[in-house]
């Protein structure tokens, strides 16, 4: 496998040039923010179009998403567009795309994608979706309905701290509601992952007394927006952006724990979060310091370590970045510092990730996920190809 990174800036364009096909199976990952695309439009440039044209009429999988910041890991954050190109010798690539408009629900969209990707040698699915309008838990459930044993690595696209609109990209055009997936096939593929959080409880456990899907109507019999306003105080004027610094830990009816981040507040005081919260679940708010988050970034990187050449994908979140402030670059450095020097990488702050924890795929919000990939020249044993996750 050959991995290459490229960047596009409003001043200077592509450095190095847009990666082009060479006949091998490939995956092209591209991350950027809305401001970058706006700047490109103002000067008559079309960097996403450049990529699309370069890889048109090939079988490559092109996956793009908007962010709350992006970097290659060896330069400044928010450089523009960041591209990580993976070229394979024996690994196969399959692609599929849909939208909520076409499918009706996120779960149906997940099923539709999975049906398009299904193959006997499918080893992992990469998927990107709107981080505002898509229920990540439902999308993961739909994928699992068809592909219960296939790990999924997913991105919920971001929009900085604005929470207004996001985009995804399949090589054709950037769209608000497209859900795009790539399947990687073949026994030569090796994937390691590390997922860690670093948040600590603040306040007591509380009971979800009314909810439906990813909408929480009542906690302890009261609208949950009031709870966030109490904890945020003067910061409640921008409740969604600042509420991302107070993720909700959810202990569901099966005693599984997950993190959910605030996405929207409705006029009746109910809240929309990044994934499902069951009625009857026990929840509590969490907070963290920059030091906490940096320590767990290093732990995630160590869990994803592999001793052979690989590419790395680092997925953090807008809430973590808001806590870290000017130290956001340090989070990526901490994660990549645990990997072999010079590992080609793409790092992005998003609205959450879909991660397979060994039992199921679900939203891991306000966590950092580090994924390393390589193509082996010999078939791995089961223990060599397993995923690694740290809590």
Feature roles, as predicted:
Residues 1-338, 343, 348-391:
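Small-residue-enriched flexible segments
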């Amino acid at each position: 496998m050959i991995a290459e990174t490229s960047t596009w800036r409003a001043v200077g364009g592509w450095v190095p040039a847009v990666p082009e096909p060479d006949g091998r199976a490939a995956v092209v990952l591209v991350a950027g923010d809305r401001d970058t695309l706006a700047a490109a439009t103002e000067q008559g440039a079309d960097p996403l179009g450049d990529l699309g044209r370069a890889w048109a009429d090939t079988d490559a999988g092109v996956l793009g998403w908007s962010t709350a910041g992006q970097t290659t890991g060896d330069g400044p954050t928010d450089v523009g567009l960041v591209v990580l190109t993976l070229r394979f010798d024996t690994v196969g690539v399959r692609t599929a795309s849909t939208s909520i408009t076409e499918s009706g629900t996120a779960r149906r969209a997940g099923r539709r994608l999975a049906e398009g990707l299904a193959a006997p040698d499918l080893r992992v699915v990469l998927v990107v979706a709107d981080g505002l309008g898509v229920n990540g838990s439902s999308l993961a459930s739909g994928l699992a309905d068809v592909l219960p044993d296939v790990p999924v690595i997913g991105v919920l696209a971001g929009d900085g701290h604005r929470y207004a609109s996001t985009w995804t990209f399949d090589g054709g055009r950037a769209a608000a509601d497209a859900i795009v997936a790539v399947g990687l096939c073949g026994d030569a593929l090796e994937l390691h992952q590390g997922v860690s959080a670093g948040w600590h409880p603040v306040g007591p456990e509380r009971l979800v007394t009314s909810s439906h899907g990813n909408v929480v109507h009542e906690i302890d019999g009261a609208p949950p927006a009031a709870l966030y306003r109490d904890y945020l105080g003067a910061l409640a004027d921008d409740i969604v952006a600042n509420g991302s610094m107070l993720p909700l830990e959810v202990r569901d009816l099966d005693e599984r724990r997950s993190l959910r981040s605030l996405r929207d507040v409705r006029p009746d005081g109910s809240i929309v979060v990044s994934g499902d919260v069951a009625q009857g679940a026990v929840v509590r708010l969490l907070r963290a310091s920059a030091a906490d988050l940096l320590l767990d970034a290093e732990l995630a990187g160590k869990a994803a370590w592999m001793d052979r050449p690989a590419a790395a994908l680092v997925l953090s979140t807008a809430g973590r970045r808001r806590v870290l402030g000017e130290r956001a670059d340090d989070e990526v450095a901490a994660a990549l510092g645990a990997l072999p020097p010079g590992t080609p990488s793409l790092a992005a702050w998003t609205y959450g990730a879909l991660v397979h924890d060994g039992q199921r795929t679900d939203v891991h919000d306000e966590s950092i996920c580090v994924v390393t990939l390589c193509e082996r020249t010999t078939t791995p044993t089961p223990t060599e190809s397993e995923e690694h996750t740290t809590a």
